[in-house]
Amino acid sequence: MTITITQGNITYSKTDAIVNAANSGLREGGGVCGAIFGAVKKLGGLKAHQQLTQACRDIGHCPTGDAVITPSFALAAPFIIHAVGPVWNGREKDELVAPLTPQELKQVDELASAYRAVLRVCRENNLKSVTIPGISTGIFGFPKNVAAIIAKQVCEAEAGDIEVNLISYEDDSLIELRTAPTAEGLALLNGHQF
C-alpha cells in the first residue's frame, strides 16, 4: 500500500483513475467536478465532453456514500470514479465544538462510505492507482479537518495494494491532509468508529 499526499490539479494525474467529487445526479457542477468536466472538454473537445455527460446520464444516479465509474474520454487517467459525499448540514466551522452531534456523525459515516466505495470500484475494475481529492470539502461544506482524518484512515485501512494519491488544489486542505489527525479533529470525532 502506498499513500501519497500532493498538491496540484487532479486533471493532470496519470493514475489509473481520478475521483470526481460528484453530486448524486452525476451532473456537471462546480469545484473539482467542474474542473474535471472542463478539462475533458478542453483536451478532448465537445465530443469527449458530450460522451462523459452521456455516460453519467446513462448511469443516472449515485446515492450519497457510493461511487460509480466512467471512462475519462480525454484525460491522462483513463477512468473517472464519481464519488458522492454528503452535503454538510452540521454546525458552521466557528460553532463546531466536540463532540459531533448524531446527525453530524451520520455524515461522517457517509463520507467514509464514499471513500470505501472508491476503493471498491478500483478493486472491481482492477485499477492499481487512484488520485482522490477532498470529497465533500468544497461546495458541500464538510469540515476539512474531519474530512482529512476520514480520508487518511479509510485509505490506510482499506487500500490494500492500490496506490492512493490524496490530492489538494488548495493550501489549507493540503495542510489538513498532511497534519491529520489533529487533536481538534479527533476530539470532534470523540472516538467514533467509521
Tell what function each PLM region has:
Residues 1-194:
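Macrodomain-like recognition of ADP-ribose-binding/processing modules
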